[in-house]
């Protein structure tokens, strides 16, 4: 009784303190319906009108691809080729309650959530819809850790970075209302020593805080597709159900140059689109799609490509190498009384681990990849899923082709979870802290028996080790309960495949701008960084083109070059 009373007091204090701190926030978006104004320039890939030449072709209309396209369209013609369909075809994508449903929906080859199982035996998913993973994720929004920028090997314009974040945030990011379970878990984090209390912030900060969300307070999802509305509709075309099969290259004395792409529509008909003049092909197909497409196009390890009878365009030993996935370990508690469903809005952040939680209604069908395998026991009542994420990580694996000719056949992916013992150590630290979280007064009312410490909960799945000092037992727990956090990244790293301008080294007019480019997760959730990256790189490219054209004018070549079709913003077919 005393502990329950103390929990209530802590809860009231927590809400009061956070309320005082939430008022000091930057300008965010206002609650509204999902804005599909961009549909006026969306085409099905079967439309022959799409074939022609553009200043930029972007492969992938996902988290980074949409803001990149919108930005480039300010001055140039842009074609976005998205392999998935429109989100309007799947209404559950657009509501917070649909997060679990979308994982439950059977993969028919077209659904927005594409299923795969890594060679580690862990279930996982990819986005296959306009908006990419920003259309299927849990909606968490946070800016990158400031230390992340220093580790990338890139000289960032931090003023531009911050302006770019704001460009994203005033359209699709919201300050979430305090949900009951999220407030409770936040109180537990503070009580367990994940300090300080940072109130509301979209910055990556050590401690406990309420973070931004791409779900508004009516439960409507806002994703990267809405950033297309900021583009110039006269310069922008988006093709859906367009599976890019290969990059087209030309070769001459100036080297190998990307000049276009081959893509197929939903009927299997082949099409081509080209870039003109100083234009580029930009891959934004993600950590699995971008290395896969490079390999299929003959850019990768020479001996590997030769063994598959793929003509080598450029020898690149690190394409498909160094892919990482942040391990997710967790505890599920089944409380004695029903709790409301909630998405992640409260985070507990330390240098060794990141923690969060969702609460959910019962499952009648396994949500694919929510648990490590489909054989995992299902909750028959409301439950809380309390999660630990290992930052980094340091363990890494590979993307290799499952088909040497068909992009629709997903590649083989192996992440080698916990092969690096530092990752395992961070998991042990995080799960021990989760034990402290379970032992707080804040979670006492969620026990089914009045027992001390971590005992007394109705646990679904593997319980924490009883002995909080037994590192070996925790290591076993980490290995046996690991699931994907869905935050996999790498495969086309800056410094190995790309230069600091995200150009594929040794090839002209080809860049990669997406989650395949860095070896570590930028924050507790990567979505905010990659939304920013698309816009940021769009501005960088515009600035490069502007400087180049100014130089050409100064050399007296304006009439011959600047007035040629490549530099106009109209479409040419």
UniProtKB/Swiss-Prot annotation:
Ligand binding (substrate): 356, 485
Enzyme class: lyase
InterPro entries reported in the protein's UniProt record: FAD/NAD-bd_sf, GMC_Oxidoreductase-Related, GMC_OxRdtase, GMC_OxRdtase_N, GMC_OxRtase_C
Gene3D superfamilies, per database record: 3.30.410.40, FAD/NAD(P)-binding domain
Residues reported in the UniProt entry to bind FAD: 63-64, 82-83, 129, 133, 137-140, 244, 486-487, 515, 526-527
Reaction catalysed by this enzyme: (R)-mandelonitrile = benzaldehyde + hydrogen cyanide
Superkingdom: Eukaryota
Active-site residues per Swiss-Prot or TrEMBL entry: 487, 525
Leader sequence segment: 1-27
Location of the protein in the cell: Vacuole, Aleurone grain
Similarity remark: Belongs to the GMC oxidoreductase family.
Subunit field text: Monomer.
Protein name (database record): (R)-mandelonitrile lyase 3
Organism: Prunus serotina (Black cherry)
Lineage, uppermost ranks: Eukaryota, Viridiplantae, Streptophyta, Embryophyta, Tracheophyta
